[in-house]
Amino acid sequence: MEKFNVHTGVVAPLDRENVDTDAIIPKQFLKSIKRTGFGPNAFDEWRYLDHGEPGQDNSKRPLNPDFVLNQPRYQRASVLLARKNFGCGSSREHAPWALQQYGFRAIIAPSFADIFFNNCYKNGLLPIVLTEQQVDHLFNETYAFNGYQLTIDLDAQVVRAPDGREYPFEITAFRKYCLLNGFDDIGLTLRHAEKIRQFEAERLAKQPWLNNKLVG
């Protein structure tokens, strides 16, 4: 998992409440057994004018010119600004995969759905909760200034705006540690690989019958 320390990026404003996971990555794209390739289909039903299916050549599909991510000023955005209850709906880890593979490193919103919120951390995508008043101000700034950027300093737990304003945010010490070091669940486990091997060797020596396989 990619480490997250300080990130500066263009902000894209998704001015909709209750954006659910089916909007983030529609159900037909969940058939893949791979963990990659979801970025081109993030927000598929809003992003394109036709119906998308797995395996299509997205470069040949008609884009929706009214959708925010198709507007030139936001096409290189890496910070998503959203409204309350972002990521609601069914539980699918494909949603943070799609957003991250699109190019987003962080999402700022007044609130997130719990499962989506947790899945973001597990996949190196930083969800930041600010107040509705703060988010409203950032929407206004994003609309007012072309190429509006924010700097997110995870170590300091603050979002810095170009006008000098700072927006502190909360994050647990464990989640912060994992993001700063690029540890997902597997990475955390592998840090203890030698202890795991030692335990397995001792277990096998003391209880060898547990390793026997039934035949027939």
Curated annotation (Swiss-Prot):
GO molecular function list: 3-isopropylmalate dehydratase activity
Family, as annotated: Belongs to the LeuD family. LeuD type 1 subfamily.
Record's subunit section: Heterodimer of LeuC and LeuD.
EC number: 4.2.1.33
Protein name from the UniProt record: 3-isopropylmalate dehydratase small subunit
Keywords, ordered alphabetically: Amino-acid biosynthesis, Branched-chain amino acid biosynthesis, Leucine biosynthesis, Lyase
GO biological process, one term: L-leucine biosynthetic process
Listed pathway(s): Amino-acid biosynthesis; L-leucine biosynthesis; L-leucine from 3-methyl-2-oxobutanoate: step 2/4
Catalysed reactions, semicolon-separated: (2R,3S)-3-isopropylmalate = (2S)-2-isopropylmalate
Domain of life: Bacteria
The UniProt record lists the keyword DNA repair: no
UniProt cross-references to NCBIfam families, sorted A to Z: leuD (TIGR00171), PRK01641.1 (NF002458)
Gene that produces this protein: leuD
Reported function: Catalyzes the isomerization between 2-isopropylmalate and 3-isopropylmalate, via the formation of 2-isopropylmaleate.
GO CC, alphabetical: 3-isopropylmalate dehydratase complex
Pfam families found in the cross-reference section: Aconitase_C
